[in-house]
Amino acid sequence: MKYQDRITTEPGKRGGKPIIRGLRITVYDVLDYLASGMSEEEILSDFPELEQEDIRACLAFAADRERKLVSGA
């Protein structure tokens, strides 16, 4: 799975921040929920429009962004 298939940016949604499949849920939102201790199951229960692959895409997006920051790309 390529995260680019699930993570998009749209100028009119959430200020152009990376969002999941055109929904109004940002990558940051999902990462923040995980960092606060929510499990994937809790997130999926609270946001039934999300899929497990969406959460994995958020993690892949964050890893790719970190890799680019470290490498200076």
Locate the predicted segments by residue.
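Conserved phosphate-binding loops in nucleotide/dinucleotide-binding enzymes
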Residues: 19
